[in-house]
Design a protein with these regions (language model features):
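Conserved ABC transporter NBD signature motif
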Residues: 61-72, 76-77
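Conserved ABC ATPase signature
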Residues: 93, 132-136
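Conserved ABC ATPase "signature" region
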Residues: 101, 105-128
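Catalytic Walker B motif of ABC-type/P-loop ATPase nucleotide-binding domains
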Residues: 157-160
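ABC transporter nucleotide-binding domain
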Residues: 176-265
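C-terminal coupling/interaction segments
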Residues: 263-308
Length: 308
């Protein structure tokens, strides 16, 4: 396996009770890269992450994580990985420092006190080191969980929807910490529902019904979508949206603040269909690049139609 590659898997699949949850997962992630997994609930994100870090054995496929075989060397993978689950899993009746000291003991961390103090400083927890974990806000709990996840100096972080239910400022601060860790050479694989977080990833993949529908940098994903998108502003937008949604050339109409994003997969047909509406003086039309949310709404719509 190339030393520059952290994850290289091909054709990973997993079923539960006869239902295929992940199908033919093929993925390459570079060392020091932040790679995002996006998709609706039940799309296979968590199962994929658990297979990559050795917590689940795939039913089919092959590959390596950190140079170890994902089927035969799962114990070695686990020692090199930090896995942060969706739910806060530390002890709420212990302080910040007590929790970190406990986790460090479990991992057998040498120079435990120094390592714990360094983690507290790195994640900005110094003012809260004696505070009980149960009294922390959601954002501070996530910082504490991230500190615990990195105590044993892992080479790969797997973060499963780490900022769900966290306010925007706390999410931003959390992502600053993730980028700092990536800059230090740690590879990060993260699942998220938030489009602004997806744009913070170096590369990303979108899953639906257990399959990767698209992957690449955020700009590559948007450019390869085949969508043409217009932004329209003006009065009575909800009535306008209802009318536009009835046009065959319009794939989707999505409200964004005080405007609508109107997208289609055939630029010429879309232009023809929108021409009468673009002639209305009370409406302002601007063509724009499709955003990730435009792309992902289209992907999940197409995937749902394919399963119908």
């Amino acid at each position: 396996m190339n030393d520059a590659v952290a994850i290289d898997v091909r054709g990973l699949s997993k079923s539960f009770d006869g239902k295929r949850v992940v199908r033919d997962l093929t993925l390459t992630v570079a060392r020091g890269e932040i790679f995002g997994f996006l998709g609706p609930n039940g799309s296979g994100k968590t199962t994929s992450i658990r297979m990559l870090c050795g917590l689940l054995i795939p039913d089919a496929g092959e590959g390596h994580c950190l140079g170890y075989d994902v089927i035969r060397e799962t114990a070695q993978i686990k020692r090199e990985v930090g896995y942060m689950t969706q739910r806060f899993s530390l002890y709420e009746d212990l302080s910040v420092r007590e929790n970190l000291d406990f986790v460090a003991r479990i991992y057998g961390v040498q120079n435990r006190a120094r390592v714990v103090d360094a983690a507290i400083e790195r994640l900005g927890l110094a003012q809260r080191r004696e505070q009980l974990a149960g009294t922390l806000s959601g954002g501070w709990k996530q910082r504490l969980a991230l500190a615990a996840t990195t105590l044993h100096n892992p080479k790969l972080l797997l973060l499963d929807e780490p900022t769900a239910g966290v306010d925007p400022k706390a999410r931003r601060d959390f992502w600053l910490a993730i980028h700092q860790l990536a800059a230090e050479g740690i590879t990060v694989l993260v699942s998220t529902h938030y489009m602004d977080e997806a744009e913070r990833c170096h590369r990303l993949a979108y899953l639906s019904f257990g399959q990767i529908l698209t992957q690449g940098t955020p700009s590559q994903v948007a450019a390869s979508s085949g969508l043409t998108t217009w932004v329209v502003a003006g009065p009575d937008l909800m009535q306008l949206a209802e009318a536009l949604q009835r046009l065959p050339a319009v794939a989707q109409v999505v409200p964004f603040g005080d405007a609508l994003h109107v997208s289609g997969t055939d630029a010429a047909q879309l232009a023809t269909a929108l021409a009468p509406y673009q002639a209305r003086v009370e409406l302002t039309w601007t063509q724009t690049q499709p955003g990730l949310e435009d792309v992902f709404i289209q992907l999940v719509t197409e995937a749902g139609e394919g399963k119908a």
